[in-house]
């Protein structure tokens, strides 16, 4: 099945402020939908602020919304999300808000109304039931309890 043949997931949204922008992709096939600021905010070095997007969405059941940083803002200006990734559960109906932080040590950054400040991706979220066991079976990769750099850096 080609990307153009895949069914489109419909995500209801509500505009809460006139300056709010509908989440959109820069290029067809992109996974992330840009979230834009619905207000202007100045972030001093080291400062964080919660930025309003002016929209609310209804993430479909069986899915989750993940809010991720925009790489260009991070690389060029040191702007990132405080809680990356942010999680939007299917039951949440409030305004999408993006907690940004200015990691730059010397430059103030101005978030302007309409500026793309984060990306939203929608992912399937499995229904799970956790089952207590005495012993966990080894995975196919035999990793065991190795974590935090156990695969090396090279």
Q: Which residues make up each language-model segment?
A:
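DUTPase catalytic domain/fold
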Residues: 1-154
